Structure formats: structure tokens, C-alpha cells
């Protein structure tokens, strides 16, 4: 499964470079890059996981399986993030980053169920003014299985650091997570 996902991510990124290098070369917003990566990822997921019928969504914020209608985000991260970064910023990190930043950039899942949250992806541009720790901490939490409160439990997480502002962008760094830990690192 992991090798299959690695290939899917690699092919989707290749399509992004082939079709939308303008976004990277001109340092467009991370959301624009994430959107087009998700479009190509969806194509690859549908081809590679046809029987499973996964959905690919950007900044998905609903969990309709909850009786209280709470949004599908990492509420459990609030205290952890604030504790982890309390010495790094003058204000509380969630105020600094904005509450919306605890929504994943891209997820691969089945809508209407938490039984099969396959993949959560965080994308960051190489020239971001924020360090990687915040995104890494989110991916560790999204992939932990012991949390029952928010039932996130993604099987895998990917942190994709994309190089921008170059005529031919070099390969991105890809960090893989599972069970709340970094398990691998690739360069495509």
C-alpha cells in the first residue's frame, strides 16, 4: 500500500510540474499549488484505487458522521500546538497561524465515514517564513491511532516541501508519516 501511494504522489507531482510549473516558478500561493496538486492526485487515486472509491478533498472541514456536526479537524491539537510552540512566538500559535491552519491541505478519504481515512497531506513552499515543525506536528497527530476524541486516524501522512522560484524546480522533499511518527523521506 505504501509503495502504491508513493508512486501516486510521484506521478501527481510530475503532472503538476508538467502542467503548472508557472505556479512554482512565480511563487504563487500555497493554496493554488495545493489545489492543482489535488486535481492530479485525484486522477492518480482514481486510477490506482478504483475499487476503493476514495475522495480527494482540499481543506475539508466536515465530519457528517458526528452527531454534534463538529468540523473534521484536529481539535486535539490546540493545547499540544500551543504548548509546543509557546516559546517560539509572542502570541499563542493558533492565533499566530490562524485556526484554519489545523485543517489539512489535502485528504484522501471516504466522505461520510471515518472508517477509511487513507492519507493526509500538508504542502509547504520551500521559501515559507514558517518552519516545518508546525506541519510535522499536525501530521504526527493526524496519523496517531490512539486518539479517540476526533477520530482522525489517517493511515498515512505526507509532508511535501515544494521548491519554488526557479526555472526548473528541483525535486520536492517528501516526508511520510504513520502511527504518529515519521517513517520515511524521499526526494522525487
Regions found by a protein language model. Give the residues of each.
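Conserved catalytic cores of phosphodiester-cleaving nucleases, focusing on short active-site segments
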Residues: 105-108, 117-126, 139
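Glycine-rich, often proline-containing surface loops adjacent to acidic residues and nearby aromatics
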Residues: 12-16, 115-121
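Domain-level recognition of nuclease-like catalytic cores that cleave nucleotide substrates
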Residues: 148-151, 155-188
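Charged, often low-complexity linker/regulatory segments
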Residues: 1-43
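Short acidic, S/G/P-rich loop/turn micro-motifs used as interaction or catalytic elements
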Residues: 126-130, 165
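Surface-exposed cleft-lining segments at the edges of enzyme active sites
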Residues: 21-26, 93-94, 123-127
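Active-site metal-binding core of divalent-cation-utilizing nuclease and nuclease-like domains
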Residues: 51-114
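Short, charged, amphipathic alpha-helix that recurs within catalytic cores of restriction-modification
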Residues: 120, 131-162
Amino acid at each position: 500500500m505504501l509503495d502504491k501511494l508513493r508512486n501516486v504522489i510521484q506521478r501527481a507531482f510530475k503532472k503538476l510540474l508538467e502542467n503548472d510549473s508557472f505556479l512554482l516558478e512565480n511563487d504563487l500561493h500555497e493554496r493554488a499549488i495545493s489545489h492543482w496538486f489535488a486535481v492530479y492526485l485525484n486522477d492518480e487515486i482514481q486510477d490506482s484505487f478504483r475499487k476503493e472509491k476514495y475522495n480527494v478533498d482540499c481543506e475539508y472541514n466536515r465530519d457528517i458522521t458526528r452527531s454534534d456536526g463538529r468540523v473534521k479537524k484536529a481539535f486535539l491539537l490546540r493545547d499540544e500546538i500551543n504548548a509546543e510552540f509557546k516559546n517560539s512566538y509572542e502570541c499563542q500559535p493558533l492565533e499566530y497561524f490562524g485556526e484554519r491552519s489545523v485543517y489539512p491541505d489535502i485528504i484522501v478519504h471516504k466522505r461520510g465515514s471515518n472508517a477509511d481515512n487513507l492519507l493526509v497531506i500538508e504542502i509547504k513552499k520551500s521559501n515559507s517564513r514558517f518552519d516545518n515543525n508546525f506541519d510535522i506536528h499536525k501530521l504526527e497527530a493526524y496519523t496517531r491511532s490512539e486518539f479517540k476524541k476526533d477520530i482522525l486516524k489517517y493511515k498515512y501522512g505526507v509532508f511535501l516541501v515544494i521548491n519554488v522560484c526557479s526555472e526548473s524546480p528541483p525535486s520536492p522533499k517528501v516526508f511520510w508519516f504513520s502511527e504518529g511518527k515519521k517513517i520515511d523521506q524521499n526526494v522525487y
